[in-house]
Amino acid sequence: MNAPFEKDRRNRRVAVVVVAAGRGERAGQAQNGPKQYRLIGGKPVIRHTLEVLAKSKRVGTIAVAVHPEDSSLFNQAREGLDGDIRAVHGGASRQESTRLALAALEEVKPDIVLIHDGVRPFIDEALIERVIEAVGEDSGALPALPVSDTLKRSGVNGIITGTVPRDGLFAAQTPQGFPFRPIYEAHQKAWQSGRSDFTDDAAIAEWAGISVRLVSGSPDNVKLTWAKDIALADQRLGPAMTELPDIRVGNGYDVHGFGPGGHVTLCGVQIPHGKTLMGHSDADVGLHALTDALLATCGAGDIGTHFPPSDPQWKGAKSRIFVEHAVNLLRARGGRIANADVTLICEAPRIGPYREAMLAELSDMLQISPERVSVKATTNEGLGFIGRAEGIAAIATATVAYPGSLGN
């Protein structure tokens, strides 16, 4: 037995591989996207999984195997989470994705690695602890539950050919834990041998001669495989949003002065005018104020934090980009926009003829119904720089509901 490995079990370095590169065909991926990014309880499935792992005091680096086409979805889902969470491009199979994520952890040199399905969001700290404590120098551990259903063997045309005894049968779960070096080498050996038919990491360990110990699993630790699984998970988490919703209101303000030009852009609509607004991007004061209001609801700073005026890539950019970025951030946190209100303050141009077009633009950007959006206009009664027609100001308010209660 390796003494350093065992002498202080509480100080062993633990890393996690989260496998989340699948396409989710069985859960209706074609219509609704990969299941790990489907919303349950107002947040992506993978977000729930990562929140539990990131909060664990035993877990260090988390390497998440992500499909290359899902990088943006993953970044939105993990936004705001603390800890060393790394995205790794996955492969064509679960086994290949796991091997690539393990390779990414080589530089971390963990003592133990937990390998977990990204679509098992209902893990808990106690389960993580049981698996870690059961891992030895040269042996792994996996959570499992005794098989309780009667098992039948089927033959041709679905005719039962026998009943399988349940004695000694267990349904495996994740996270499955292993000493890092042995399981990584086992994955490498399987890859080099052309073996890609293993259904979990414990099977690879067994094939490589690594013993694996069973620990008590959790009935709650279900894998979301089918569309109905996701619907049931959403129902399970739904009350957190409906019983004591966390309602947040954010405000935003922006102002830009006029310069030479022939039009202004307000709330995404181009309006003919004898001057243009000068400033960041297309200087859409309405959308800039709205972006700040949305960011305020999730404590994500302001527009300048995400899109610095000094960065030349945003020169002349459409401000719609900023609003959609803020919407993605709050939705990654489970936010649902209830209302957005923009007040434009100017002597000219007239806003009334363009109000309906503005409402349609905002509704599309925010992905909410037009009834939840408001655009108003007022003058400054001839007072100040606005009254002198030197510029336009905007005030915006956003109301967003987040999962959980005010106590969270």
Curated annotation (Swiss-Prot):
> Where is 4-CDP-2-C-methyl-D-erythritol 2-phosphate bound in this sequence?
254-256, 280-281, 302-304, 378-381, 385, 388
Alphabetically sorted, this entry's keywords are: Isoprene biosynthesis, Lyase, Metal-binding, Multifunctional enzyme, Nucleotidyltransferase, Transferase
Q: Name one Pfam family in it.
A: YgbB
Reaction(s) this enzyme catalyzes, per UniProt: 2-C-methyl-D-erythritol 4-phosphate + CTP + H(+) = 4-CDP-2-C-methyl-D-erythritol + diphosphate; 4-CDP-2-C-methyl-D-erythritol 2-phosphate = 2-C-methyl-D-erythritol 2,4-cyclic diphosphate + CMP
Query: Where does the record place the site Positions MEP for the nucleophilic attack?
Result: 166, 223
Q: Which InterPro entries does the annotation name?
A: IspD, IspD/F, IspD/TarI, ISPD_synthase_CS, MECDP_synthase, MECDP_synthase_CS, MECDP_synthase_sf, Nucleotide-diphossugar_trans
Q: 2-C-methyl-D-erythritol 2,4-cyclodiphosphate synthase: where is this region? A: 248-408
Cofactor(s) needed = a divalent metal cation
Q: List the GO molecular function terms.
A: 2-C-methyl-D-erythritol 2,4-cyclodiphosphate synthase activity; 2-C-methyl-D-erythritol 4-phosphate cytidylyltransferase activity; metal ion binding
This enzyme's EC code(s): 2.7.7.60, 4.6.1.12
Identify the NCBIfam families for this entry.
ispD (TIGR00453), ispF (TIGR00151), PRK09382.1 (NF006899)
Q: Briefly state the protein's biological role.
A: Bifunctional enzyme that catalyzes the formation of 4-diphosphocytidyl-2-C-methyl-D-erythritol from CTP and 2-C-methyl-D-erythritol 4-phosphate (MEP) (IspD), and catalyzes the conversion of 4-diphosphocytidyl-2-C-methyl-D-erythritol 2-phosphate (CDP-ME2P) to 2-C-methyl-D-erythritol 2,4-cyclodiphosphate (ME-CPP) with a corresponding release of cytidine 5-monophosphate (CMP) (IspF).
Protein name as it appears in the record: Bifunctional enzyme IspD/IspF
